[in-house]
Amino acid sequence: MKLITKEVSNPEKKFWIWDEKITNKQDGRIYPHNTTNIGSGKSVAVYQLSESGKEEQIAQLEIPDYKKLEEYYWQEKEICLDYTYIDEFEWLGDKVPYKVEGNPYREYEKITARAAIFYSEEPKLIHLMQLKIQSEDLDFSYAGFYNLNLDICDITLVNGNVEFRDAHIIETEILLGGIECGGSRYFTPEVSFRYIKARKSKILTMLMTQSLSLDFLCAKTEETEVCLDPLPKTFENLCFVKSNISQVKLSNA
């Protein structure tokens, strides 16, 4: 799936994703209301291209300041990427997990990327690993993932869960492993894929170090595979209520 961006004037700092009602400018707090703390000040309209080349606007987001993002990531500062468009990933570094085993965890107060889009024109492998987050969820609610192989491994959330609620996962593989969650105010320790929309994608778990719940409530997918293996632990609960998933494989569950 191909996306393009066009710079736009945005003096009101209004951002939205998927539908203009999902915006930081809203009455109440139904949708994410924070915006990034590492923005560049540059706003873009994001368009999805159909196979015929027709453009459909799907978001209006801010481009992050990548130099500042790299600094915040490696200096363990609080990171908010809400309502951003991210298509550069050098700030994560270039080491794969087996090259950093034994390194100390980096500790953050919080990391969120709600209503953000992560996009690569060509399939790209990226890692979020060896992180300890003190407060809130590792939150990708309403986010979009395009053409990525995303590994989220060796993550500890002291007072939160991993959230992909209402995310759009397009031609992307998400691998989860070694995740420990402290739970949140309303939910026991879990990884949530509630209400996701996925197409031509794959979601996998392996080498789980805690008995977590996985929630796919009302998930809608096309040509998407979910492969769940909790070893050496077991799953606490699995929820597929009202979900439509192309293929589910359970191993050692």
What residue ranges belong to the model's regions?
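Tandem repeat scaffolds
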Residues: K6-S43, L49-A253
